[in-house]
Every structure is written in structure tokens, then in C-alpha cells.
Amino acid sequence: MATLKDIRVRIKGVKSTQQVTKAMKMVAAAKLRRAQDRAIMARPYASKLKEMLASLSAKVDTSVNPLFAVRSEVNKVLVILVTSDRGLCGAFNGNIIKLAYKTIHEDYAAQYGKGGVSMICAGTRGYEFFKKRHYTLTKGYPAVFQNLDFAVAKEIADMASNMYLRGEVDRVVVVYNEFKSVLAPQLKSEVLLPITSGDASAKENSGGEYMYEPNPAAIIDVLLPKHLRTQVWRIMLESNAAEQAARMAAMDSATENAKELLRTLNISYNRARQAAITTELSEIVAGAEALNG
């Protein structure tokens, strides 16, 4: 049975941990507000750019642009994985790494078996996980979210598109956490390249009569790199917001668990103290009776 001193030490340790988790929750909440605002602000631009491409692609033969071209055989795949730099965010990293692993070993098992899967990892956690397991890493971006910059998104998008244009890969897939709400980030695995020109209904509804100068094909050539960079940037912002939400929830849960543990320890402490007092009183009474006897 634990002594009073042991229980006091545990209570002190739990209180210290509770203070840390509570502070981390508050920091994550402040960061979440900023990250959420940035992610939400990026969505309309990315969405409208995608709509504009759908509208333009209805006016031209998209097969003339290699970024629209679907390869007859997919032999080489580039997987872009976005994780966090730090832990203490619940299952945020574990779940997205599992999805990336599943994407590689199930969706592209044949390509992986022939050495046809390479990766770009944004975020320390994913980078370290796959580096330790000797996956083919084209580029890693550890500690990228400590100072999140559009230049990194641009570099990743340009690297992926150049690899696709040179025929080094036949498909580019991005795996990330999309921010939906504080309680429920959504795991996503999407094809980034080749770019889909939109389904028939989207083309029909992309609407109206527009005049394009100099011509739709030339505009598409300019917009495609912007579209890819914007999508990668949006994905990184979404992941950052989802990370802060996951960390805030994890620290809130840890704080509540510490509170419950303190309650249990205090009960144990009071019981042990009461037992010690009872024992002392019994010894005093026994001693008094022995003297009187």
C-alpha cells in the first residue's frame, strides 16, 4: 500500500502535469484561431481558381496540356504526405501516416513492389517515420510548420509538376488532414496530378459566354501552375489548422484526466491519513490500558 509520502509526491506530479497541459491547451486554442482563419481565407481563392479552370477546360482540348494528360499506365507514383512537426496532438499523425501507408501498400502495391513509389514529406513526424523505414524520399521538409511559408508550398508544387512533366512519375497523390471542425478532421487522399478537367455537369454549369484574351489555352497554361501552388498551400493550411484543433482537444482531454486522477489520489490520501490516525489512536489507547493494567 502506498504511503502518505508516496501519494503526496504523485499528487504534486499530477498537479504539475495538469498545469502544463492546461497551458498547452490555451496556446493551441490561440494558434487554432489564427490557423483556422488562414485556412478559411484560402478556400474561396482555391475554389474559384478550380472553377475557372473547369470553365476554361470546357473551351479547349485539354489533351494538349501535359498536366491534364492521363497516362495509359501508372508505373511510378509520387506521394506527398503532410503531417505535423510536433506531437502531443492525439491520433493526428498516427492516423494520417496509417492512411499514407495504406495508400502505398494497397492502392499502389504493384508500383511499390517495383520501386515505383517515391515521397515528399512535409512535417517532421511523417518525414522521420518513412525515413527510418528506408522509403524513397525525393525531398523532406522537417520543421516546416514552425514558420509556415507559401514559398515551401510553391517549391513542392513545382517539384511535383516538373517530375510529372519529365515523366519521372505518372501520378501525384497528396495525403493530408483536412480541417472540417474542431472535433473531426477528415483524412484525405487525393490525386493532384494529372489534373481532372471536371465532369460534364461542371463544364455545363461553368456557365455563360466569356471572351478570353489572348485565348483559353494560353490562359490555362498560366493558371495551371498557380492552381497547383494554391492547392498545395491550401492543403498545408488545412493540415496546420487540423493539427492545432487536435492538440487543443488532446490537451483538454489530458487536463480532464489529470483532474479525475487528482480526485482519486486525494481520496486515497485521505483514506491513508485516516488509517494512520486510527492506528496511532489505537496504539495510544492500547498503551494507556497497559499502563492502567
From Swiss-Prot:
One of its GO terms (cellular component) is proton-transporting ATP synthase complex. Signal peptide: none annotated. It is a peripheral membrane protein. SUPFAM superfamilies: ATP synthase (F1-ATPase), gamma subunit. GO terms for biological process: proton motive force-driven plasma membrane ATP synthesis. Pfam families: ATP-synt. InterPro entries: ATP_synth_F1_ATPase_gsu (IPR035968), ATP_synth_F1_gsu (IPR000131), ATP_synth_F1_gsu_CS (IPR023632). GO terms for molecular function: ATP binding; proton-transporting ATP synthase activity, rotational mechanism. The keyword NAD does not apply. It comes from the Bacteria. Produces ATP from ADP in the presence of a proton gradient across the membrane. The gamma chain is believed to be important in regulating ATPase activity and the flow of protons through the CF(0) complex. NCBIfam families: ATPsyn_F1gamma (TIGR01146), PRK13425.1 (NF009958). F-type ATPases have 2 components, CF(1) - the catalytic core - and CF(0) - the membrane proton channel. CF(1) has five subunits: alpha(3), beta(3), gamma(1), delta(1), epsilon(1). CF(0) has three main subunits: a, b and c. Belongs to the ATPase gamma chain family. This is ATP synthase gamma chain.
